[in-house]
């Protein structure tokens, strides 16, 4: 994004949304502090309904997530990566840029350190940022040719049995060409953003955020030859299932939304039309994030 584009975006920051799911008093207090700080800076502030009510804010500051998407030019997510994922899946439909204050564990998507939150937010609101766009995946479940379920994911889509410790048999097609069959606990289909999440735990590769690629990672395959597969990001992936599988299957979207699948269904996966727009401060370095979050060694010399 050019500097002129950054200035143009920054100049639109009139209404700012504050969202999250505080699990303790200290996180709720941070929502309150950020709200009052933004008001002091002259911004119109919308706070997610549940949080605003907990803070006893007036009605004109309360809004649903969809209303924040419709009216805010920036949303601040206070929480961990899970909070970012759940809010971003909705806000990306409105092309709302997001920046996160990390109150979770890893914080791959929430850059701002809570100890320096005000200085870093001030820098962001003054235009000292760049925009990074990341693509989402869309899953469509077809039954006898009709769409019966649909969902988006920022990290990954996971096909798995609804019951624990059951294997399933399925075929995978890439762009209508047969790719492979598999007997396993399931299949992870991950974006570059999700390559450092569940996919990584299953032995998948790390994909840098700007790669136009999708990772297909088997879950406990019943073969020694199965390996993760990286395909072009514009690929259309289809999965169908053996009729003798257990009747209850699911596709999980970011481990937050589950779609039911029957054995005679076909799951179609491709890029979503929506994009996640993350704001990063100028000193953001993806490789530094990997090193600090994953415990990589520092330079030896």
Swiss-Prot record:
One protein family per Pfam: NAD_kinase_C
Catalysed conversion reaction: NAD(+) + ATP = ADP + NADP(+) + H(+)
GO molecular function, one term: metal ion binding
EC number: 2.7.1.23
Record carries keyword Thylakoid: no
Gene Ontology biological-process annotations: NAD metabolic process; NADP biosynthetic process
Cofactors named for this entry: a divalent metal cation
Catalytic residues (positions): 81
Keywords tagged on the record: ATP-binding, Cytoplasm, Kinase, NAD, NADP, Nucleotide-binding, Transferase
Subcellular location, principal: cytoplasm
Top EC class, one word: transferase
Described purpose of this protein according to its UniProt entry: Involved in the regulation of the intracellular balance of NAD and NADP, and is a key enzyme in the biosynthesis of NADP. Catalyzes specifically the phosphorylation on 2'-hydroxyl of the adenosine moiety of NAD to yield NADP.
Similarity-based family: Belongs to the NAD kinase family.
This protein's name: NAD kinase
Gene symbol of the encoding locus: nadK
């Amino acid at each position: 994004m050019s500097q002129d584009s950054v200035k143009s975006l920054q100049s639109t920051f009139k209404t700012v949304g504050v969202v999250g799911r505080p699990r303790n008093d200290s996180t709720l207090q941070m929502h309150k502090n950020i709200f009052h700080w933004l008001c002091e800076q002259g911004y119109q502030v919308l706070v997610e309904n549940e949080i605003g009510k907990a803070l006893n804010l007036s009605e004109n500051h309360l809004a649903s997530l969809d209303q924040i998407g419709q009216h805010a030019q920036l949303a601040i997510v206070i929480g961990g990566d899970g909070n970012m994922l759940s809010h971003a899946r909705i806000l990306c439909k409105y092309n709302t840029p997001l920046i996160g204050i990390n109150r979770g564990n890893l914080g791959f998507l929430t850059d701002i350190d809570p100890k320096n939150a005000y200085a870093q937010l001030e820098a962001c609101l003054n235009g000292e940022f760049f925009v990074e766009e990341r693509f989402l995946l869309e899953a469509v479940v077809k039954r006898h040719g009709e769409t019966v379920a649909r969902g988006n994911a920022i990290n990954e889509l996971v096909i798995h049995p609804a019951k624990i410790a059951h294997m399933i048999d399925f075929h995978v097609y890439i762009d209508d060409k047969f790719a492979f069959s598999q007997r396993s606990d399931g299949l992870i289909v991950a974006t570059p953003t999700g390559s450092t999440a569940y996919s990584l735990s299953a032995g998948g590769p790390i994909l840098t955020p700007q790669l136009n690629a999708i990772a297909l990672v088997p879950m406990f395959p019943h073969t020694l030859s199965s390996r993760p597969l990286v395909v072009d990001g514009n690929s259309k992936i289809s999965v169908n299932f053996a009729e003798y599988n257990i009747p209850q299957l699911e596709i999980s979207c970011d481990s937050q939304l589950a779609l039911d699948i029957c054995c005679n269904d076909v799951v179609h996966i491709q890029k979503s039309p929506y994009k996640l727009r993350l704001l990063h401060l100028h000193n953001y370095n993806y490789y530094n994030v990997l090193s600090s979050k994953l415990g990589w060694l520092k330079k030896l010399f």
